[in-house]
Amino acid sequence: MAKHNETGTQAEILAEQHLVSQGLTPLARNYHCKGGEIDLIMQQQRALVFVEVRFRKSAAFGSAAASVTRSKQQKIVTAAQHFLMDNSKLANLPCRFDVVAITAGQIEWIENAFTLNE
């Protein structure tokens, strides 16, 4: 496994552990479809939470959160729509898009980081 893939996997595990400690339940990790990918799919009470995990060793080149571009957001939304089509039992739950940014070892959980309309 390439070093960056290994680091990404470790960041996703750390993010998932953090979200579980906050009361969320994991449903899927690294959900792929033709149009995109979602790092984590969690459930918080009766809401589905689609999570993008971003990692930076330092903030020297910008924050981890700032690296979630509009293009990346659109790919996450496309993947979320695909997930909901594949999992019709969950399709009526409210959904949101969060980012977990890990920069220099600090975890920042940004709820409702973006919406479908952005």
From Swiss-Prot:
Q: Which domain of life is it from?
A: Bacteria
One family from Pfam that matches here is UPF0102
**Which is an annotated GO molecular function term of this record?**
nucleic acid binding
Q: Which PANTHER family match?
A: UPF0102 PROTEIN YRAN
Family per similarity comment:
Belongs to the UPF0102 family.
Q: What is this protein called?
A: UPF0102 protein Sde_3146
Species of the source = Saccharophagus degradans (strain 2-40 / ATCC 43961 / DSM 17024)
